[in-house]
Curated annotation (Swiss-Prot):
Chemical reaction(s) catalysed: [ThiI sulfur-carrier protein]-S-sulfanyl-L-cysteine + a uridine in tRNA + 2 reduced [2Fe-2S]-[ferredoxin] + ATP + H(+) = [ThiI sulfur-carrier protein]-L-cysteine + a 4-thiouridine in tRNA + 2 oxidized [2Fe-2S]-[ferredoxin] + AMP + diphosphate; [ThiS sulfur-carrier protein]-C-terminal Gly-Gly-AMP + S-sulfanyl-L-cysteinyl-[cysteine desulfurase] + AH2 = [ThiS sulfur-carrier protein]-C-terminal-Gly-aminoethanethioate + L-cysteinyl-[cysteine desulfurase] + A + AMP + 2 H(+)
Protein family (similarity comment): Belongs to the ThiI family.
Pfam families: ThiI, ThiI_fer, THUMP
Keywords carried by this UniProt record: ATP-binding, Cytoplasm, Nucleotide-binding, RNA-binding, Thiamine biosynthesis, Transferase, tRNA-binding
Protein's UniProt name: Probable tRNA sulfurtransferase
HAMAP family attached to this UniProt entry: ThiI (MF_00021)
Domain annotation THUMP: ranges: 60-167
Residues that bind ATP: L185, L186, H210, F211, R267, G289, Q298
Amino acid sequence: MLDWYISVSFGELTLKGKNRHTFEKRAISKILDAISDYKIEEYYQEQGKLYIKADVNDFDEIIDHIKKVFGIVYISPCVKCEKTVESMQDGVLKIIEGKIIKDKLQTFKVDVHRVDKRFEPKSPELNPLLGGTILKKYGNYVKVDIKNPDFFIYVDIKDNCYVYTDRIKGWGGLPIGSSGRGLLLLSGGIDSPVAAFLMAKRGVRVDCLHFHSYPFTSQRGFEKVKQLAEEVSYYTGNINFYSVNLLPVYKAITKNCKERMMTIISRRFMMRIAERIANENKIDALITGESLGQVASQTIQGVSVINEVTSLPILRPLIASDKTEIIEIAREIGTYETSILPFEDCCTVFTPKRPVTKPRIYDVKREEENLDIEALVQECIDNMELIKIRQ
């Protein structure tokens, strides 16, 4: 009897040695959460893959949800066969039916992977045998090409036998939560949502912190950033969205510090506030969308001065990326169109005409002596808002 399943192949999880079981268990949990709205008849693991049985009519939607789970290399609709040559022959005929395009000659190659080495005949004998079965029935539409075929027909012989042809690419990476927690400084721009996506791909559970300067920034600008957080949560899962009004800090800097120091000093305040929130919520690291040289504060000297105010690691996944590369990812994950909506954020509203690009820590600290740092940080945190974004 032939049954349709979805097979899920894990990526780096297979390299995790003794921790592999823990990583796979976490990934499977995320997959089942992602497809919980669908009727799943059964699921099980077999030698490095997860197999899911569901209604074939739901396959496209189920696969679309599974693709968004990090830790997966590819997904394949497959036919489960009995471990006999006859059943495999039926399996390859069933799987190729959907690949044949009438009136267009296509080429294929059979690729047998015999995990169970006790099974006979061996792969070099099975490949032409199964290929011959296909040619006998569909020789008018397909032919064999072992060097450059239009598609492969894969046959995995394990405890059971599975036949498939499509390998639908997943995002790879590691399952969410397997690499700790991070607090993303989320602006309204293109970069920070991409940074969130990339860190989530590495297994980091991401929460978001947004700084605004209402009423100098608009409510519509805030709603834009909240929408970005919701779009990011499609990949990261549930997000705690912290909103902080940084206006008291900007006013104090404007009154007491040199204008050209505005950007670097305000960034240091952002890191101080972010560190407080992270420590109070057991978050392991801070995340930014900074890219080296992209704006005035994103120089090596600027990054060094910003780092000085926190003992937490600051993860910068975009630090060596070109803007075109960042935009490409933003388009792919669906955040680009929201990011380019024309609303200003606090960084653009209070940008000095000639910001310092190579700040020295001594000069910055001397300017900060004119500020009551702890009082300003506390004032911002006291007025913080928290929005829980849930999938």
